[in-house]
């Protein structure tokens, strides 16, 4: 893992991205509550730090985009479920059916993250996507002790502290297909054990709440942005668990694709038909296993 960390560090520096390598002494000064004992199950040798990296509150970002869209004349309809698509005689999509009535449109863009398979199924399409659950949970609030996000590949979890003092934890996928946003106890146990090993000072905290999000995992770990075989229907999804940070760029490329009818050069390779052409974009090299990405 240290070799992979150094390789990532060098790659970041080559691209002009601020990064620092922290040895044990520097890490102890930066994160004093971390267990750096030699007797740990996975002794910590060092860390990679991105000082300019940060955390954005998901809800606040959504509110900001919604307010900006509303100011520009976009009609945002809440609590309105899509139940199907209207189709013309030639098969072209001509609108959306919802619980509040039909909405006519010459072009329809689908961007529904974890429910991509379900919504596109309403149009008769089966996607090369699996839906998996990704859990997170928060503790009771405590005084500030952690002002960075810490993640580890060996223990396979991440930890941070919210502005309200809650300790936020998350780990890997639950490993089975589901739309139930509940998660499982084994995952909670594994992540909690790993967190206590790295930060023993949280061992007596109580969990306040837990939830799971539905992840749209593609067969190669890369997103799909572009046209579909159905005229007038466009799709943006398959972002696995990295979609939030890609929101501005993916939205811009998706808007360009819908407006012009052709993909932007930035998303031209991320087509739906790449899986049939053996043109997959498997950056991780994990193979055709959605849960491995």
Where is each model-derived feature located?
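Active-site substrate-recognition segment that forms the wall
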Residues: 84-92, 101-231, 291-293
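Helix-loop-beta segment of a Rossmann-like dinucleotide-binding subdomain
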Residues: 8-9, 19-21, 28-72, 172-178, ...
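Helical element adjacent to the flavin cofactor pocket in flavoenzyme catalytic cores
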Residues: 47-107
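Short loop/edge segments at beta-strand edges and connector loops
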Residues: 23, 78-80, 209
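Dinucleotide-binding Rossmann-like beta1-alpha1 core, especially the glycine-rich loop
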Residues: 1-33, 156, 186, 194-196
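C-terminal catalytic lobe of FAD-dependent flavoproteins
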Residues: 19, 154, 196-293
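A general structural signal for well-ordered alpha-helical segments in protein cores
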Residues: 2-5, 24, 62, 116, ...
